[in-house]
Swiss-Prot record:
Prosegment residue ranges: 35-59
Residues with glycosylation annotation: 261, 420, 461, 542
Function: Cadherins are calcium-dependent cell adhesion proteins. They preferentially interact with themselves in a homophilic manner in connecting cells; cadherins may thus contribute to the sorting of heterogeneous cell types.
Membrane-crossing residue ranges in chain numbering: 620-640
Domain Cadherin: 61-165, 166-274, 275-389, 390-494, 494-610
GO molecular function, one term: calcium ion binding
Domain notes: Three calcium ions are usually bound at the interface of each cadherin domain and rigidify the connections, imparting a strong curvature to the full-length ectodomain.
Organism of origin: Rattus norvegicus (Rat)
Topology, Cytoplasmic side: 641-801
Protein name (record): Cadherin-20
Mode of membrane association: Single-pass type I membrane protein
């Protein structure tokens, strides 16, 4: 069994046989677990510090709990308690074992004596209790001597944690002018100590900084205003420091602090005031409408919506000439021009401007009035203005037959300035590119300069300029619209070419065409045209004209029996007259074709040439024509054939063509890939060769006639005629001013190294080609293909080298 008393008392109380005893020793500062059993009591009663009654009351006994204080700072292990078995005779045969939470790490046990110690610093805030198991074993056999029993070690709290503000620092806002006691914000501090044990976690609040403006409730932590009429304009920001102290605020308690930043929000408690009671401004008389004259500003100590302003002109002689608007960003009043100004008409204006708050709080009306006024004096400054036309626009009507130089309008302008300078008039030629008009430079008389034609231009829009004589930069302008009135100067005419068709079987009185006319003149009351046959066709026996009295006319036949063979086309002149003054007329021609038609009146053919030949040809004439055509064709073919079979120029055989080339070898055995042929004709006529042929890349050097003999093959020495000829040509080339400045001479002093062919001198060892076979040249590869063809394939005489 587990107990905390002496063995005799434990046996008498519990009536048990063999048992295991618990001994516990507590620190002297706490309740001592004496040799008598400890009754189970509440912790706040056991450690509250209140006087305990000396009367003994009967309670239930708890034997399986130990108590130890946290934060032990001694150097020796902290003694917790003692385990003892009644089977332990003190000879060390019993071994005590401790297991469970913290066994061997936090708590240790002396396996011989059963003493339990704490070897680590304990913190109740980290762990409030530990549950362990104890067992007594036979040291020699390891057999359990007692059943395993469980017990608890509780950590008793001490005041080792100060209150903390987990949400600090705090930010709060309260309106200015708030009444005393207005709640601002609530702060909360927490204490990690055991709230059920003593006053370690009992927190009270106090204010360390921020008085006399604010106060704090000691229990709830609510911060309130403590001073009335706090003005934001005087002081806007406050820093309040709040302290939270445990142990109920008693001396020795731990404390924590936090900062509360409080801002006074604005209310509309300040009326606007103009810093100036009089403003003076100036504006040019030429300032356009809506241009800015100046600004006024009413100062308001409030901010935001409470500082919004509204400016109005409440009085003065300039209310109709000027306007004022409020700038929403800067809350200033902007005075602008409302209508055009004139220095000559009025030189100054006076305005009375009011600035007011549109948002007023009723509880602060006693601080008003919330508007203010100021006086603005505006002076109009004179400028040199351009001439002004009266009227501002001209509309002129003129007939198109007006004579050149006729005055159609007097344009008038004047200088609005007091100096009244002289004016010169002109026309903006960009508005009158045809130069139909001109204006008198001094009088402003607008006159015609060219004949007018309404049918060409019925409207003219010109711009007349007026310039001051003393200041040509001052130019005024006015628009003049000129309408050209119509006169009857155009005769009516057909709008298009009329062509009518009449059938051969047409009857008399049949309608063959309806015609109309157009007139370019402008009709005032509607044009009316009259149609009739022209005088030269008044007695036309074939056709007649009937006026429809609606500006159209019908063309009718007078007879029947029209025949294409007799006359296929008729031309009918028609006279068209208008109703203008004077009467104008013109003659239009109607073309009428006679056509073959079907019985139902559909036109079949209007071309008489389709039915007969204009000239009868005999069969003999046709045969003669065909014969001439055949002869011409044969001649053409003969000429073409002769041109194609023209004798071709003589082409020199390829084998003989080798005599026309000089072959240059950079090394022996190079074959045709190392050759560069030169046209022999260029040697005979170097001027033409230079003009016609593209220049060739060559290796230039000064001509050395005297050294030529050392490079000439031996065969050349035998033929002295050829040698002399070459020297003569070389000298001629050197002396020719048109020849290239250098001749290309190559030196062949060494035979090529590594050539599969031996010396070429073997080619000259025989007296004739028949004495030696040159078939081996074909085995030397493509580089010697040309040489193999020269010596192996040719059957003619050997070339002369």
């Amino acid at each position: 069994m587990w107990t905390t008393g002496r063995m005799s008392n434990a046996k008498s109380w519990l009536g048990l046989g063999t048992s295991l005893y618990f001994w516990a020793l507590m620190d002297l500062a706490t309740t001592v677990l004496s040799s008598t059993p400890m009754p189970e009591v509440e912790l706040d009663t056991l450690f509250s510090g209140k006087p305990q009654s000396h009367q003994r009351s009967r309670r239930s006994w708890v034997w399986n709990q130990f108590f130890v204080l946290e934060e032990y700072t001694g150097t020796d292990p902290l003694y917790v308690g003692k385990l003892h078995s009644d089977m332990d005779r003190g000879d060390g045969s019993i071994k005590y074992i401790l297991s469970g939470e913290g066994a061997g790490i936090v708590f240790t046990i002396d396996d011989t004596t059963g003493d339990i110690h704490a070897i680590q610093r304990l913190d109740r805030e980290e762990r409030a209790q530990y549950t362990l198991r104890a067992q007594a074993l036979d040291r020699r056999t390891g057999r359990p001597m007692e059943p395993e029993s469980e017990f608890i070690i509780k950590i008793q709290d001490i005041n080792d944690n100060e209150p903390k503000f987990l949400d600090g620092p705090y930010v709060a806002t309260v309106p200015e002018m708030s009444p005393v006691g207005t709640s601002v914000i609530q702060v909360t501090a927490t204490d990690a100590d055991d709230p059920t044990y003593g006053n370690s976690a009992r927190v009270v609040y106090s204010i360390l900084q921020g008085q006399p403006y604010f106060s704090v409730d000691s229990k709830t932590g609510i911060i309130r205003t403590a001073l009335m009429n706090m003005d934001r304009e005087a002081k806007e920001y406050y820093e309040v420091i709040i302290q939270a102290k445990d142990m109920g605020g008693q001396l020795g308690g731990l404390a924590g602090t936090t900062t509360v930043n409080i801002t006074l929000s604005d209310v509309n408690d300040n009326p606007p005031r103009f810093p100036q009671k009089h403003y003076q401004m100036s504006v040019l008389e030429s300032a356009p409408v809506s241009s800015t004259v100046g600004r006024v500003f009413a100062k308001d100590l409030d901010e935001g919506i409470n500082a919004e302003m509204k400016y109005t002109i409440v009085d003065g002689d300039g209310a109709d000439a000027f306007d004022i608007n409020t700038d929403p960003n800067f809350q200033v009043g902007i005075i602008t021009v409302k209508k055009p100004l004139s220095f000559e008409s009025k030189k100054s204006y006076t305005l009375k401007v009011e600035g007011s708050n549109p948002h007023v709080e009723m509880r602060f009306l006693n601080l008003g009035p919330f508007q203010d006024t100021t006086t603005v004096h505006i002076i109009v400054e004179d400028v040199d203005e351009p001439p002004v036309f009266e009227p501002r626009f001209y509309f002129v009507e003129v007939p198109e037959d007006v004579t050149i130089g006729t005055t159609i309008q007097i344009i008038s302008a004047k200088d609005p300035d007091m100096t009244n300078n002289s004016i010169r008039y002109s026309i903006d030629r960009g508005s009158d590119p045809g130069r139909f008009f001109y204006v008198d430079i001094t009088t402003g008389a607008l006159m015609t300069a060219r004949p007018l034609d309404r049918e060409e231009f019925s409207w003219h829009n010109i711009t007349v300029l007026a310039m001051e004589m003393n200041n040509p930069s001052q130019v005024g302008s006015v628009a003049a619209t000129i309408k050209v009135l119509d006169v009857n100067d155009n005769a009516p005419e057909f709008p298009r070419f009329y062509e009518a068709f009449i059938c051969e079987n047409a009857k008399a009185g049949q309608l063959i065409q309806t015609v109309s006319a157009v007139d370019q003149d402008d009709p005032h009351n509607g044009q009316h045209f009259y149609y009739s046959l022209a005088p030269e066709a008044a007695n036309n026996p074939n056709f007649t004209v009937r006026d429809n009295q609606d500006n159209t006319a019908r063309i009718l036949t007078r007879r029947s029996g029209f025949r294409q063979q007799e006359q296929s086309v008729f031309y009918l002149p028609i006279l068209i007259a208008d109703s203008g003054q004077p009467v104008l007329s013109s003659t239009g021609t109607l073309t009428i074709q006679v056509c073959s038609c079907s019985d139902d009146g559909h036109v079949m053919s209007c071309s008489p040439e389709a039915y007969m030949l204009p000239v009868s040809l005999s069969r003999g004439a046709l045969i003669a024509i065909l014969a001439c055509v055949f002869v011409l064709l044969v001649l053409v073919l003969l000429i073409l054939s002769m041109r194609r079979h023209r004798k071709q120029p003589y082409i020199i055989d390829d084998d003989e063509n080798i005599h026309e080339n000089i072959v240059r070898y950079d090394d022996e055995g190079g074959g045709e890939e190392d050759t560069e042929a030169f046209d022999i004709a260029a040697m005979w006529n170097p001027r033409e060769a230079q003009a016609g042929a593209a220049p060739k890349t060559r290796q230039d050097m000064l001509p050395e006639i005297e050294s030529l003999s050392r490079y000439v093959p031996q065969t050349c020495a035998v033929s002295s005629t050829v040698h002399s000829y070459v020297l003569a040509k070389l000298y001629e080339a050197d002396m020719d001013l048109w020849a290239p400045p250098f001749d290309s001479l190559q030196t062949y002093m060494f035979e090529g190294d590594g050539s599969v062919a031996g010396s070429l001198s073997s080619l000259q060892s025989a007296t004739s080609d028949s004495e030696q076979s040159f078939d081996f040249l074909t085995d030397w590869g493509p580089r010697f293909r040309k040489l193999a063809e020269l010596y192996g394939a040719s059957e003619g005489p050997s070339p002369l080298w």
